Amino acid sequence: MKTLLLTLVVVTIVCLDLGYTRRCFITPDVRSERCPPGQEVCYTKTWCDGFCGSRGKRVDLGCAATCPTPKKKDIKIICCSKDNCNTFPKWP
């Protein structure tokens, strides 16, 4: 009986994965944080605003449940699903 109970506990722990959550870089501080439960996708969103010529592209890093869809054609979104895979872009 104890063996059956122990087996059930182990199977439950393996199936629940002990509440693992993805880690992604988050802006504005560009630091690694745990994503909220259910958000397993990291994303990097880049776009130009009115100051793009003097300051460069804007960058937004974060977590999402699914890869966000760009609302405008000049917005670029890259998604990934490994811990801290959405590093700040390197500009040429």
UniProtKB/Swiss-Prot annotation:
Single GO MF descriptor: ion channel regulator activity
Location (main, coarse): secreted
UniProt keyword annotations, A-Z: Acetylcholine receptor inhibiting toxin, Disulfide bond, Ion channel impairing toxin, Neurotoxin, Postsynaptic neurotoxin, Secreted, Signal, Toxin
UniProt entry tagged with the keyword Secreted: yes
Signal peptide feature range: 1-21
Location of this chain's protein in the cell: Secreted
Disulfide bond positions: 24-42, 35-63, 48-52, 67-79, 80-85
Short name of one Pfam family: Toxin_cobra-type
Record's keyword annotation contains Glycoprotein: no
Entries under PROSITE patterns matching the protein: SNAKE_TOXIN
Tissue specificity annotation: Expressed by the venom gland.
Cellular component aspect of the GO annotation: extracellular region
Top-level taxonomic group: Eukaryota
UniProt record similarity statement: Belongs to the three-finger toxin family. Long-chain subfamily. Type II alpha-neurotoxin sub-subfamily.
Role description: Binds with high affinity to muscular (alpha-1/CHRNA1) and neuronal (alpha-7/CHRNA7) nicotinic acetylcholine receptor (nAChR) and inhibits acetylcholine from binding to the receptor, thereby impairing neuromuscular and neuronal transmission.
Protein's UniProt name: Long neurotoxin 1
Organism in which the protein naturally occurs: Oxyuranus microlepidotus (Inland taipan)
